[in-house]
Each structure stands twice: as structure tokens, then as C-alpha cells.
């Protein structure tokens, strides 16, 4: 029996405002990534204090960069004709690459302002990032986007909102490889090699 992806992209509604799984993925990714850095990775008291201030820069970079990346890279002509919709992020539409660029820019600005090494914070983000990637790819699967190639395999999935073909659940492959495996590898390097952030 093949699995059919009939998930609703909307997790729940609050006062007629739809809260999507993709939004929750960002929220959970940021929260768990922040907790992991605070409780496990950061040992220096000064960096702990700076990281408290840095997290707001990080969130701004993720949201603005991710949204602008989606607008520019994926649907520029549409948003050029409907500019007000650029601000409607609750309707979905974020870019991983745009978010990455946003993080680098806001991290640079924060480091320059506080006269600290930019690589301290980029290292922390890169070690914790697979947590966010895991949640993000799972939400991609729920949304039925970034689908894989056509397959006849037993674990193929139907994405009825995409087409009527059986496809690889590539989002779950990426969640496993880029989320779980990458997280393990990054942390093995960090802890086994006595790696110093920065």
C-alpha cells in the first residue's frame, strides 16, 4: 500500500490566522538550536552573554534573508506585480539560501558592532543548523514541496497536489542526511577534536 501525502500545510488556526507547519519548523528550529548552543556548546561566560544579544540578529537574518531569497530567486516576476505580498510571510515562501545569506550579513553586523570574531557565531550556527534543517525538511514533506524523482520503489509517496506519479520522499532523505547525520558528524568533530569555536 503506497503512502499518499494528504497532510494539511496548516497546522492550526488562531483567530482566523493560519499557522503553517513551515512556520512552526522555523520556530522549533530556532528554539532548539538556541537551547543547544546555550546549554551544550558555549562554555565561555562572555560568549554566553553575547549570544543572548546575537539571537535577535540571527532571527532577523533568517526571516528577512529567507523571504527576500524566495522573492528574488523563485518568484520575482510575481512579487514584482504583487509587492504587498512580499510581507505576507504567513502564506509561506522562504529560501534556505536566502536565509543563509541573511545570517552571514547579520552575523557580520553583530560582530562588527561588538568587536568580536565573526567565526565564533558562524561556528555555533553551523554546528546547530542541522536541527533547523531537520524541522525544515519535515515541513517540506508535509507541504508536498521539493518532491523527489519518479520511482517504483515500495517507499515511494504520492503527492496529489503535485502530480499523480509515485515519487521519492526526497525531503525525508534530506531530513535524515542533512539533519540527523550532519548533526552527528558536526558534533563528533566539535567534541572529539576538542574544537574551539572561532
Task: Describe the role of every protein-language-model region.
Residues 1-198:
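A feature for loop-to-transmembrane-helix boundaries and adjacent hydrophobic helices
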Amino acid at each position: 500500500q503506497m503512502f499518499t501525502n494528504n497532510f494539511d500545510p496548516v497546522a492550526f488556526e488562531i483567530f482566523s490566522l493560519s499557522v503553517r507547519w513551515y512556520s512552526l519548523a522555523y520556530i522549533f528550529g530556532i528554539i532548539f538550536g538556541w537551547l543547544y548552543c546555550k546549554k551544550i556548546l558555549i562554555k565561555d561566560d562572555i560568549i554566553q552573554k553575547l549570544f543572548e544579544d546575537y539571537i535577535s540578529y540571527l532571527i532577523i537574518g533568517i526571516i528577512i534573508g529567507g523571504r527576500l531569497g524566495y522573492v528574488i530567486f523563485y518568484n520575482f516576476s510575481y512579487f514584482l506585480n504583487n509587492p504587498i505580498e512580499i510581507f505576507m510571510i504567513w502564506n509561506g515562501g522562504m529560501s534556505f539560501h536566502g536565509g543563509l545569506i541573511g545570517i552571514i550579513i547579520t552575523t557580520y553586523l553583530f560582530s562588527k558592532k561588538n568587536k568580536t570574531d565573526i567565526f565564533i557565531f558562524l561556528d555555533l550556527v553551523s554546528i546547530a543548523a542541522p536541527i533547523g534543517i531537520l524541522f525544515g525538511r519535515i515541513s517540506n514533506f508535509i507541504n508536498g514541496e521539493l518532491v523527489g524523482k519518479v520511482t517504483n520503489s515500495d517507499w515511494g509517496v504520492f503527492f496529489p497536489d503535485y502530480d499523480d506519479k509515485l515519487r521519492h520522499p526526497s525531503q525525508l532523505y534530506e531530513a535524515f542526511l542533512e539533519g540527523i547525520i550532519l548533526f552527528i558528524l558536526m558534533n563528533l568533530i566539535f567534541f572529539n577534536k576538542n574544537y574551539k569555536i572561532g
